[in-house]
């Protein structure tokens, strides 16, 4: 009986299998759209906000209270007419040329000594160069003095007490270069901006003006060519010593390049000529041979006289004046208004109306 029950159970219908669970469908991942790389926002270049008071050029540095540095530089040639090499010409803002004995000498004015390359050959002072430097409240650097230059410097209190009078020699901020083109001891005294700055720190040199807004007497405009001026593509300056400096206007460079002794006037540091946007030729009474050493005397203060201004290939007669030795030079156009110089470098020559002068065409 029990066996039949088991058999009956085994002979029943086969149960249906449980339905399989459905496999979940794989999730579809959306492909992200490529993200555009953002363009970097360009950093605006700051505009120059200051003006170099010696050139009128825009600058990022505020020089309004900075004292310029004036350096006496030899200007001569060898017997064959080869120019004695000069360094620093291209970095000078203003270049003076005046006679000394039977030759001429230069004074380079630098607004900034940062990065100032070799300046050479540094030579001795003369009183009228000291006077011109004082019109800018400049620190005056030289190698030696004439007797009258020494007397004038002492009288004007340009001495080590105020550290305005920087004597450049091998014991201070100078060094000599004996290889060509420097040619030994006499024609090789050299300094640099870094050496000058080091000496200023050592001496405690006053490197800023005593008063705010120092007035150099210089006015600038972008277009200074004389409106009614005469053509002056070339000019010839003759000093009382019969030394001749010539200029030719270079329209591509926008200024006057110079020749001396029929050679291009270049900076030995760069090998290139220098273009001056402005050329000022100022007449002044000149005495030659005032002592046994044939020194000269030139009126540079407490005086006024005529002159010429050259810019853009044109010439204009002007007048200049200056009061005391600590006052700036003033320049006036032919209509009596303040003369507007072109933005850039300036060359200034003092000549005699009776022993030389200037001609142009």
Where do the protein language model's features map onto the residues?
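A surface/extracellular/periplasmic glyco- and lipid-processing/surface-interacting theme
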Residues: 46-92, 96, 101-361
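Sec-dependent N-terminal signal peptides
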Residues: 1-3
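Ser/Thr-rich, Proline-interspersed low-complexity disordered segments
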Residues: 12-47
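C-terminal motif of bacterial Sec signal peptides marking the signal peptidase cleavage site
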Residues: 7-10
């Amino acid at each position: 009986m029990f066996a039949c029950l088991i058999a009956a159970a085994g002979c029943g219908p086969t149960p249906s299998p449980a339905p399989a669970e459905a496999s979940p469908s794989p999730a579809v991942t959306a492909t992200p759209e490529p993200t555009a790389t953002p363009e970097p926002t360009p950093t605006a270049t700051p505009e120059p906000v200051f003006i170099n008071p010696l050139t009128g050029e825009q600058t990022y540095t505020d020089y309004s209270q900075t004292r310029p540095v004036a350096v006496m530089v030899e200007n001569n040639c060898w017997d064959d007419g080869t120019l004695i090499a000069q360094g620093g010409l291209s970095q000078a803002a203003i270049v003076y040329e005046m006679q000394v004995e039977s030759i001429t000498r230069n004074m380079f004015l630098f607004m900034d000594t940062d990065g100032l390359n070799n300046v050479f050959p540094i030579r001795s002072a003369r009183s009228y160069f000291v006077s011109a430097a004082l019109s800018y409240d400049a620190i005056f650097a030289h190698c030696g003095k004439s007797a009258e230059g020494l007397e004038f410097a002492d009288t004007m209190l340009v001495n080590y007490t105020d550290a305005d009078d920087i004597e450049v020699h091998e014991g201070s901020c100078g060094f000599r270069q004996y290889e060509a083109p420097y040619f030994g001891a006499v024609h090789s005294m050299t300094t640099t901006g870094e050496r000058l700055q080091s000496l200023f720190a050592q001496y405690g040199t006053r490197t800023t003006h005593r008063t705010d807004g120092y007035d150099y007497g210089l006015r600038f405009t972008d277009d200074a060519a004389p409106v009614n001026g005469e053509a002056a593509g070339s000019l010839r300056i003759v000093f009382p010593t019969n030394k001749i400096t010539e200029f030719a206007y270079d329209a591509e460079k926008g200024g006057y390049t110079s020749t001396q002794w029929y050679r291009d006037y270049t900076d030995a540091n760069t090998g290139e000529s220098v273009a001056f946007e402005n050329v000022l030729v100022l007449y002044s009474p000149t005495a030659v041979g005032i002592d046994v050493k044939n020194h000269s005397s030139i009126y540079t203060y407490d005086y006024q006289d005529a002159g010429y201004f050259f810019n853009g290939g044109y010439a204009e007669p002007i007048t200049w004046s200056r009061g005391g030795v600590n006052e700036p030079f003033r320049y006036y156009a032919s209509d009596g208004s303040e003369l507007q110089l072109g933005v850039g470098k300036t060359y200034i020559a003092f000549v005699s109306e009776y022993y030389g002068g200037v001609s142009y065409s």
